[in-house]
């Protein structure tokens, strides 16, 4: 569930998009019933010929998971961002990471009760994100970490990606009774159960001890094989 403030922002974005479309200002928007990633239509010149391609953008925030399990939280932040344009049948080829931390130089003794030290979060998150990106073969062209005292309350961990695919290779059909469903995913264990709701429930100073297992452990060596299914 979203917080009230976040929900209001989301509603305003949807209303804004509808207004822009009604004014004819989003002619390049790829409209579909799928909810995977922001998708636009762009002309691409290949060997002297112009083709229509779909370019897809997606970002993922893993503030809470990274706060309690830095390595896994940041790793699956990138993995989750890759998942959606991949579901849209596009090949993800570039990433961006924007994060926020309190001062990582603060002595461990000054760590707030129920929190990990800022240095532990910052270093662990950087290692987790880069580990996933290196193993799945995705270049991150922009990395920016902001430092502010307010981030001591909650870490900011944002991963964003961009993917693309020839428009004529993306088939969109409605499912019907009797269709065969194939599930693809990286190998994982029991970790991650409850992770989707973890950021919305009330936490205490003891949450750090019990919620680490809710953060999914990604498996990029397995996942990389099905990213190749979308290669143009």
Regions found by a protein language model. Give the residues of each.
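Gly/Pro-rich turn-and-neighbor structural signature
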Residues: 5-48, 52-53, 137, 141
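Single conserved hydrophobic/aromatic residue that forms the stacking wall/gate
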Residues: 1-6, 10, 228-232
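Mobile "lid/hinge" segments at catalytic clefts and subdomain interfaces of large enzymes
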Residues: 36-43, 51-229
């Amino acid at each position: 569930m979203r917080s009230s403030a976040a929900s209001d922002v989301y509603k305003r974005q949807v209303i804004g998009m509808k207004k822009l479309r009604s004014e004819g200002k989003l002619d390049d928007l790829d409209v579909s019933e799928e909810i995977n990633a922001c998708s636009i239509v762009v002309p691409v010149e290949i060997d002297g010929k112009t083709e229509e391609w779909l370019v897809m953008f997606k970002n993922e925030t893993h503030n809470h998971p990274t706060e309690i399990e830095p390595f896994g939280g940041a790793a699956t932040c990138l993995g989750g961002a890759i998942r959606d344009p991949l579901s849209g049948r596009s090949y993800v080829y570039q990433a961006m990471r924007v994060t926020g931390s309190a001062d990582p130089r603060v002595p461990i003794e000054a760590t707030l009760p129920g929190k990990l030290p800022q240095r532990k979060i910052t270093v662990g998150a950087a290692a987790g994100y880069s580990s996933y990106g290196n193993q799945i073969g995705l270049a991150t062209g922009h990395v920016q970490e902001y430092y502010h005292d307010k981030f001591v309350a909650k870490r900011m961990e944002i991963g964003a990606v961009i993917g693309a695919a020839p428009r004529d290779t993306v088939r969109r059909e409605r499912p019907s009774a009797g269709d065969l469903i194939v599930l693809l995913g990286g190998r994982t264990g029991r970790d991650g159960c409850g992770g989707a709701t973890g950021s919305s429930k009330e936490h205490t100073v003891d949450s750090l001890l019990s919620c680490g297992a809710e953060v999914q452990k990604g498996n990029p060596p397995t996942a990389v094989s099905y990213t190749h299914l979308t290669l143009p």
